[in-house]
């Protein structure tokens, strides 16, 4: 059972949650003054239109027609499936649906914001985009978006994933991008981390620092971000806006689930439904799933912290493990981040979104089961949502409740098979930090 919308029903507007949050979003702070950051300073890092969108309090922002056409070209609208085989296997009264973002040409949701960011960069005459990537899904998406727009792309890929997922970097290079393992010798920040540990596994926080340092050396370059900031999450709401139309063909969901690293795929599916809750029009349960190796929502602190390890970004108020936290080299590279989106942090802090965390072994077990039953090999990141869905369906069986679960299968795992191989051969390692929570992420003890 599936629903595929015609091209004409690709959303025409992105949904911006800022005006609907239960409390005002704390402003990003300039690290030099500790005052709200001047948007003009951000324009040296980001495309001007993206800075404007980041600060906008308009509830809806029009999707440029050229971007909508490209959405169609790369596989939007994506299909929504019912996981009937999984339901039967679990013998649950729950009905399980999933939005499959792995159906895009790059294999994940990341292309939704990559196309938008590259479009605005091209309009502003930007010649080069520089970014970070964890598992490589975001780097792949921006590489293609740059190719389609005629913009050069450079990607700093967290070293652990660079080594675990060699074909991701091949795919980025096919699309014309330069790819470097992070930390690298390209930047002073990279050299610093390598001097501390020549075999440093890297992290999203370090890769972000390297990308920004790179951009600041080139007037015609700008930084492109794959998650965390609100304009990125807003571009992803095409997922939830499509899913709302598709679920009308079936039934309303009761529970909405997504994995979280920075928060973009969760927000993409959930925020259009969160709006109904904030407006008092409906009730849903929202579950945000993170790895126990990077438990920013479940074990972090809610405070101001840098968005990167090298302290180049503004300070953001968010759930954080501290920007110097060394994220273990789990296979879900896209979830290896010390913080989480400020807008999602507000929703977690207000009890609207419930966070949970899992070890990677149990996540891969759920992923392998899903692959055997439904035929799709999920990305390790997306598999966190599958594990939570299975647990929720089992709970529904135990309690005798007929509930409807909708989760985001944010990407396929066909280039993540090394992680599956380690799972099948019993070599996966689980990581869980012992020294959390930290008291002050801006001044952690050495």
UniProtKB/Swiss-Prot annotation:
The modification N6-(pyridoxal phosphate)lysine is found at residue 110. Its EC number is 4.2.1.20. The keyword Amino-acid biosynthesis applies. Belongs to the TrpB family. The lineage of its organism: Archaea, Methanobacteriati, Methanobacteriota, Thermococci, Thermococcales. Tetramer of two alpha and two beta chains. InterPro entries: Trp_synth_b-like, Trp_synth_b_CS, Trp_synth_beta, Trp_synth_beta/beta-like, TrpB-like_PALP, TrpB-like_PALP_sf. Keywords: Amino-acid biosynthesis, Aromatic amino acid biosynthesis, Lyase, Pyridoxal phosphate, Tryptophan biosynthesis. GO terms for molecular function: L-serine hydro-lyase (adding indole, L-tryptophan-forming) activity; pyridoxal phosphate binding; tryptophan synthase activity. The gene is trpB2. It is an enzyme of class 4 (lyase). HAMAP family: Trp_synth_beta (MF_00133). It comes from the Archaea. NCBIfam families: PRK12391.1, trpB_rel. This is Tryptophan synthase beta chain 2. It holds the Pfam family PALP. It catalyses: (1S,2R)-1-C-(indol-3-yl)glycerol 3-phosphate + L-serine = D-glyceraldehyde 3-phosphate + L-tryptophan + H2O. Pathway: Amino-acid biosynthesis; L-tryptophan biosynthesis; L-tryptophan from chorismate: step 5/5. The beta subunit is responsible for the synthesis of L-tryptophan from indole and L-serine. One of its GO terms (cellular component) is cytoplasm. The keyword Kinase does not apply. Its cofactor is pyridoxal 5'-phosphate.
